[in-house]
Amino acid sequence: MAMQPGTSLPIGGLSYVKGSDTPPLSELTVPALLANTAALHGSRPAVVFREQNIRWTWNEFSAEVDRMAAGLHALGLRKGDRVGIWSPNRFEWLLTQFATARVGLVMVNINPAYRLAELEYALNKVGCKAIIAPEAFKTSRYLDMLATLAPELAKAEPGALNAARLPLLRWVIRMEDVPTPGMLT
C-alpha cells in the first residue's frame, strides 16, 4: 500500500491506521462492547449516579440503552442523524452516548455553559435533528433558552418543530418527566 509522504499513514484503504498491537486493541463497536460486557458481567454494578439515586447492573444498563435506542429510532432518527445532548454529567448523558451509538446516530456534545448565540450556532452548524436537555443547570435555564431560539416550540407537536432560527431541529426531548408543549420527555 502506498504511504503518505513523510508519514506512516496509508493512502486510501481503511479509514483508520492500526498501530502497535501490544497489548491488542479491541476492534469492537461501542454497542458490541456493551453487549459483551453485559453478557460477561450482567449482574455486576455498571452505573452509579448517587445524585439521581440510580444504580444499575450491566444488564439493566444494557436494557435501558436498548429502550432509548428503540425510542430514538421510533422518532424517525436514522444512521448519521445528529442528536445534541446539552447537559452536565447525568445518567441521561451516559445513556444517550450508548443509545445513539446503538442506532448509528452522531451524538453532538453541546457545552453545558453555552448561551443563546453559541447554542444557535452549534445546532445549526452540525445540523442537529434532535436535542436532549434538562430544564436547567446552575444558572443556565436550558429549556427557556431553547424556547427563545424556537418560540414555535410552544405550539408545535413533538417532532414537528419548524423553527425559523433552528431549521433542522425537529425534536426537543426534556430529561425531566414533566409534560411541556412541543417536547417529549
Question: Where does each model-flagged region fall?
Answer:
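Conserved AMP-binding/adenylate-forming core of the ANL superfamily
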Residues: 26, 35, 46-98, 115-120
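Flexible, non-catalytic linker and terminal segments flanking ANL/adenylate-forming cores
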Residues: 1-28
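Short, histidine-centered active-site or binding-site loop motifs used for metal coordination
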Residues: 15-18, 50-53, 127
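Structural core segment of the AMP-binding/adenylate-forming
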Residues: 75, 103-185
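A short, structure-level motif marking secondary-structure boundaries and short turns
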Residues: 18-20, 53-54, 80-82, 103-105
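Short, flexible loop segments at the rims of nucleotide/cofactor-binding pockets, characterized by
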Residues: 22-25, 60, 108-111
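AMP-dependent adenylate-forming
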Residues: 9-11, 33-57, 176-180
